[in-house]
């Protein structure tokens, strides 16, 4: 396709591609410009350690994949996407060889939680059953007219609670509290923050509703399928093309930017209305991530073998330990025992490594922009629950916050969330209004995870922004 274009999308991450696909489905001529040599943003796979070992650069487990209303309606399997479902979505080891598992089956999970099983069912069963209605409400801007008010109210009354408050109300056993802490800590918020429970509620409900699957072959498989579908619709993706100024773009009726607020300020500058520019200037980043990838000569030697039943493992010990880790990060300190999110893809997808070998993906939260190397402390947490792990390491890759940003400009300071996900910035993302994607400049839209519904690989930020453009510009 050659100019003229109807719409230009800046950034070929999942939200940018979702925006482009939505526009192309409506008959618009669309081109996507991507600074990196490969599309995907945080949804890419790279040989980070040794040849033949395929590691996910960013997102590695996809609870929103089959649950996203946008992804679910696309024929991505036609382009090679296949979801692999582990035996269990999640494992959480504890000291003494114990472990608690989140099973796809709510019944099996309840059975493993002893005296907390009934309370767990009472908390999660309504969200699991009502997920399609809840998704319709929470995966769009906060300011809207609800269609499913009872389901939204039931979810919202729990979601508004801080992580600790919900734990104290719902659970008594160390196992149930630890399972909740590990999932809720995906929010990267202090456990005292209002609204922090929303992330854990959604993620655990999705674990029961659709699982936490991984794409066969790596995260790149999802990106490649999205690109292929866009091209089948007549769209185009141009990689290796950095956009530094809107004035350098071809003429188009609409520009949708899958970029950080900081980049939008650089691109649009004084074109933006003062109130919107002020909102972007005041945007607060979340904490950063420090990421390790490993090539192993065998599987992780877990003390509790049930940990090998899940692709995702949360390492951090008890509720109180994980709470302390997230508090330290929020206060600008490096945790002594960090909360570690780990994925062991090759147990379920051996195509990602040479025969008999394995990959491990792991990261921990650190203060924004931290330059402290915490490789040893992350490895110590793995070794704590899998003695002998270090002996199986062939090679490792270290991506500190600065390296993450070099790989993906949207990860400013190593923040993988598109900005803090506290209650204020979930509501005003980046502005509180019915259409938070419109910038105030006709035809210019923000469509990154710094817009509703925020972080996660679901494509809904791009989809919602494209619908706004179709209504306002092409309607």
Name each model-derived stretch.
Residues 1-7, 25-26, 207, 425-426, ...:
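Extreme N-terminal leader/targeting segments of oxidoreductases
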Residues 3-133, 420:
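N-terminal glycine-rich phosphate/pyrophosphate-binding loop and immediately adjacent elements
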Residues 95-194:
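Rossmann-like flavin
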Residues 119, 299-300, 333-336, 370-409:
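Flavin-binding catalytic cores
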Residues 173-190, 336-341, 388-452:
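A glycine-rich dinucleotide-binding beta-alpha-beta segment and adjacent secondary-structure elements
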Residues 203-244:
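Helical element adjacent to the flavin cofactor pocket in flavoenzyme catalytic cores
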Residues 235, 241-353:
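Mid-domain catalytic core of redox enzymes
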Residues 447-470:
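A conserved FAD-binding loop/helix module that cradles the flavin
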